Amino acid sequence: MAGSNTLSSSEHGDDPRGHSYSIHIQTRGTTLDKYPAKQHARNVARQLGLTDGLIYLMSQSTRTLEDSDQPQPFRQRRYFFYLSGVDEPDCHLTFDIKSDILTLYVPHYDLRKAIWVGPTLRPSEAMMRYDLNAAKTYDELSKNIRTWASKRMSPVIYILHEGQKPNINAHFLAFNHEDLLPAMDACREIKDEHEIDLIRRANEISASAHIEVLLGIRNMQNEAEIHGKFLDTCVSQGARNQSYEIIAASGENAAILHYTKNNEPLDDRQLVCLDAGAEWNCYASDVTRTFPRRPYWPSCESANIYSVVQRMQEECINGLKEGVRYLDLHILAHRIAIEELLSLGILKGGSTEEILQSGASLVFFPHGLGHHVGLEVHDVSPTPLMAFSLDKYKGLPLLSCRPPCTLSAPYLKAGMVVTVEPGIYFSRPALKDARRKPLSKYIDMDVVQKYIPVGGVRIEDDVLVTRDGFENLTKAPKGREMLKTIR
């Protein structure tokens, strides 16, 4: 994580034996640097507008693969983590809003499990590691909920989903599964300093993995080697999990937006699109770089398209700040793409506005400019970034990574972390489909054929929105620095 390891230091002094001393308070790895679970719980309660009630969440449970005795890879429920900071299975959590008490319930000690896979989390250990008021074993959960409910005329427990109620038989309890999710989504949209540090650290590891790939790409023969080098670097730095499946797409595979086979020979393919990001303490990074296998562009076409996407990204990032509509930046990216593709002769026969309205630019840039990043790589928010407020751009669809769609386009707020990931692609299926549509009159298919071997170019960074601008959290080299890194 970024930031100083020292919270404060005392005055220097001398002990009775004449030895000098100084005291430094270290915050890393101590109670002063815990994940801020209680503040998150308070924020959610405030968002709910409540002064009383009980929030209940359950962690992901231990599971085995279908028809197997092998464990399913564990991935913590993100809403549970947001209110606990706990990355352990089979736990439960309550937050008593009125009393401001956050309680974790952990599994009983299991000797057999301790022998085979190691001991489970104990209450005393949980209190040391996490920002809690209390930690107890699971057998106390039912009793404690009953005690809490007995002191209230109309006790209401707030849960995420109908199927995630605590295992308690009490007819007098009311469960609300409608309000908690949107309240948590609203809170998760804005990241605090601790969360930003986690995303920053995930980006640091991802940057070093991207650099390692660039350093070795000249001698790699297969997409699988790219995948392996990236993963190896992340794991060796403590990031065992990826935020999403690694995309190591060479040549025309780079035109497949979520290509994950990663098993084809590199041969004479012009470019590699590597979309890969490490996860750190459940927080994601999302980074894409597109590069040649040598420290120079293998063709005019590849250099041209990289330059187009680079301009799209730079101008959109420079436009980020609080109060800006992200949708407007998405439309700006399309305008830049159209201007540049017109100059290259790929688009033709219309003005920038005419082509934008036709939707022809979507053939080459078919996805949204970006999304929120946080506990999910496509993180939650109460309103999707890519919602349209007007039906002005009929050719551009409602582009959103997550439902629900809305007719109110949101404005950026300080504390949001968003990706900026424009791309230009030459997808054979997309081009074949375009030939049958009226928008084909704006596309010079003969010129396009020269660009097919480029496949696709995407450049993606994770960017923190601030009150007066932005901070780019992604440090992986791009452009000239990227080419210099290839040896």
Swiss-Prot record:
Amino-acid positions noted as binding Mn(2+) 1 in the UniProt annotation, renumbered to this chain: 286, 421, 460
Location of the region described as Disordered in the Swiss-Prot/TrEMBL record: 1-22
Reaction equations catalysed: Release of any N-terminal amino acid, including proline, that is linked to proline, even from a dipeptide or tripeptide
A single GO BP: proteolysis
Entry coiled-coil feature ranges: none
UniProt xrefs under CDD domains: Prolidase
Record's compositionally biased regions (Polar residues): 1-10
Membrane-spanning residues: none
Pfam short name (any one): AMP_N
Free-text comment on the cofactor: Binds 2 manganese ions per subunit.
Cofactors, names only: Mn(2+)
EC code: 3.4.11.9
Group of enzyme by EC: hydrolase
Function: Catalyzes the removal of a penultimate prolyl residue from the N-termini of peptides.
Protein name, as recorded: Probable Xaa-Pro aminopeptidase CPSG_02684
Source organism of the structure: Coccidioides posadasii (strain RMSCC 757 / Silveira)
